[in-house]
Amino acid sequence: MHVLSVSEINAQIKALLEATFLQVRVQGEVSNLTIHKVSGHAYFSLKDSQSVIRCVLFKGNANRLKFALKEGQEMVVFGGISVYAPRGDYQINCFEIEPKEIGSLTLALEQLKEKLRLKGYFDEANKLPKPNFPKRVAVITSQNSAAWADMKKIASKRWPMCELVCINTLMQGEGCVQSVVESIAYADSFYDTKNAFDAIVVARGGGSMEDLYSFNDEKIADALYLAKTFSMSAIGHESDFLLSDSVADLRASTPSNAMEILLPSSDEWLQRLDGFNVKLHRSFKTLLHQKKAHLEHLAASLKRLSFENKHHLNALKLEKLTIALDNKTLEFLRLKKTLLEKISTQLSTSPFLQTKTERLNRLENALKLAYANLKLPQFGALVSKNHQAIELEALKRGDKIELSNEKARASAEILSVDRV
């Protein structure tokens, strides 16, 4: 038997395995997943309850995956066995990877839904309210589509005062996602301007799931969620439910249904207005009768007022006026008294008045002296004290006095006073 070297046996194994297992499908659970940050290659193991095999997914194939590869996923990998002869290692070089029971697109969509759910894209609290009477609506659709024709027809019938503006958009195929995103951004750019739209409706008629799948794209979801203008998603038929339907503020089953939901019916509102008019007329008549009855009651009450009651009211008014007059009189007297006291105080402290008073006193004394002189007997004398005339009965012991007449003047001191 020929003896083989290690290199020879590994080379033969490599040739045999790679030729025999050129294309294989292997099912197992993903484990030990590592994604190289620089190269972008993914390295992992595929295992079942008894065995493990290593796998590699190179960057080019990894970029084509519709979903994120994660630990614990049950996958079916398609590829070929490759052997690294220097170490005798072998692995599966994966070309494609699919979930075991669901397609890769389905798994990718479920992962995207969970991502957006955590970001609040589906929360009712983040939804904008539907405008009650839209005046201007942007419709993102193909201007040559049957959907646009149906929407215009229904809008003109239901609410003709609303202006529908078609933003021509590619609604399927390559470039659809970018076209829809740009149209949403354009319509929303008018927000808070005089040409602002009250609503943005993304509309497309029915088709295959492949045709509609663009509306499951994350970029369209982002554009709808970030729009400041109220948005509606009306894609396909009733049975078609896409990611845009969940993210938009409101979903319509079809483009026509979007107009029926968004726009009020003018016929219904005319009927409502007629009903309001009837109710208003009835309410006015009822109120008029009530007010008339109330006025009649007041008139009867006024007639029942007697002359005595009127006289009593006048007496009360007179009493109030008398009290008020008395109060005003007392107040006037108090003010006058205060004013007089102030004037008296000012006069008593006036230097001019004091000078005049002193002069008047001197004149009075001189007058008394003159008068006394007139009454003097032939041998009598005028008695004065401190240059002021004084009567004898006013003197007391110790007083120093002056005696004077026309011929002489003398000083004396009172030794005693006898009362007669």
From Swiss-Prot:
Q: Name one Pfam family in it.
A: Exonuc_VII_L
Its UniProt entry gives the catalysed reaction(s) as: Exonucleolytic cleavage in either 5'- to 3'- or 3'- to 5'-direction to yield nucleoside 5'-phosphates
Q: Name one GO molecular function term.
A: nucleic acid binding
Whether Hydrolase counts among this entry's keywords is yes
EC numbers for this chain: 3.1.11.6
Q: Which GO terms describe its biological process?
A: DNA catabolic process
Asked if Cytoplasm is a keyword of the record, the answer is: yes
Q: Where does the UniProt annotation locate this protein?
A: Cytoplasm
- The primary location reported for this protein is cytoplasm
Q: Name one GO cellular component term.
A: cytoplasm
Gene3D superfamilies per UniProt: 2.40.50.1010
Q: What keyword terms does UniProt attach to this protein?
A: Cytoplasm, Exonuclease, Hydrolase, Nuclease
Query: What NCBIfam families does the record tag this protein with?
Result: xseA (TIGR00237)
> Member of which family?
Belongs to the XseA family.
Give the matching HAMAP family: Exonuc_7_L (MF_00378)
Q: What does this protein do?
A: Bidirectionally degrades single-stranded DNA into large acid-insoluble oligonucleotides, which are then degraded further into small acid-soluble oligonucleotides.
Q: How does it assemble?
A: Heterooligomer composed of large and small subunits.
User: Could you tell me what this protein is called?
Assistant: Exodeoxyribonuclease 7 large subunit
Q: Which organism is it from?
A: Helicobacter pylori (strain J99 / ATCC 700824) (Campylobacter pylori J99)
